[in-house]
């Protein structure tokens, strides 16, 4: 399941984030790429040792954790390995798949990948996120403060930036539900049960769906 959420950041959070990043020290993005992804990665990233990194990570993680749609669809256990990435003219990230395990001393799975857009789409040419699916490529270039989340199993790439600057936050989620099909089933059931509750209250139909949702979550969560 691929999901987009608009305005995951407030306007104040977006301004704070972009203002701090405009003064940040960016380094070669290849330092955080896997051995094969290094061959196709050309961007820069905020130095992970910079003093502002912790507060910026907390800002983004808090924004995600307070969003109900994110929680219902993703079932996050750990949000991790955030990167504050910048693409300038001629920079790109070729087709690649994300590492299955990420982290420093403690490893987390990459079940769900996300890109949080910080730059206005009109401010740069190119730079689309392309998710490669068997039935065809999907292209994403969202408004600032909006996010796209997708299974980390997909090949994906970032097209070459021709003009302007593309600023994004990328990161990964270790989900309680590792299988994308199971996450989608739970999300669909949850959506229907909430709709029934809104119309009919705590009905017999709601109780049956609530029981099924809870039992599947109990069976699948790890």
Swiss-Prot record:
State its Enzyme Commission number(s).
1.14.11.-
Q: Which GO terms describe its biological process?
A: DNA damage response; intracellular iron ion homeostasis
Required co-factor(s) are: Fe(2+); L-ascorbate
- What molecular function does GO assign, one term? L-ascorbic acid binding
Q: Which Pfam families match?
A: 2OG-FeII_Oxy_3 (PF13640), PKHD_C (PF18331)
**PANTHER family xref list:** PKHD-TYPE HYDROXYLASE YBIX
Q: What is this protein called?
A: PKHD-type hydroxylase cce_3668
Taxonomy of origin reads:
Bacteria, Bacillati, Cyanobacteriota, Cyanophyceae, Oscillatoriophycideae
């Amino acid at each position: 399941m691929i999901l987009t959420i608009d305005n995951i950041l407030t306007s104040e959070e977006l301004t704070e984030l972009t203002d701090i990043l405009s003064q940040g020290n960016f380094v070669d993005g290849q330092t955080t790429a896997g051995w094969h992804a290094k061959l196709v990665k050309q961007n820069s990233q905020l130095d992970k040792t910079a003093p502002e990194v912790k507060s910026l990570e907390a800002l983004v993680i808090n924004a995600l954790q307070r969003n109900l749609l994110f929680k219902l669809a993703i079932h996050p256990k750990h949000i991790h390995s955030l990167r504050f990435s910048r693409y300038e003219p001629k920079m790109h990230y070729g087709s690649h798949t994300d590492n299955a395990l990420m982290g420093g001393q403690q490893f987390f799975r990459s079940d769900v990948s996300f890109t949080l857009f910080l730059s206005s789409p009109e401010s740069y040419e190119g730079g689309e996120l392309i998710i490669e699916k068997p039935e065809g490529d999907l292209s994403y270039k969202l408004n600032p403060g909006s996010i796209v989340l997708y299974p980390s199993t997909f090949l994906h790439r970032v097209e070459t930036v021709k003009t302007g600057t593309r600023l994004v936050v990328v990161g990964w989620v270790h989900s309680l539900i590792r299988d994308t099909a199971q996450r989608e089933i739970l999300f669909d059931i949850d959506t229907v049960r909430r709709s029934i509750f809104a119309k009919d209250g705590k009905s017999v139909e709601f109780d049956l769906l609530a029981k099924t949702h809870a039992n599947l979550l109990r069976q699948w969560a790890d």
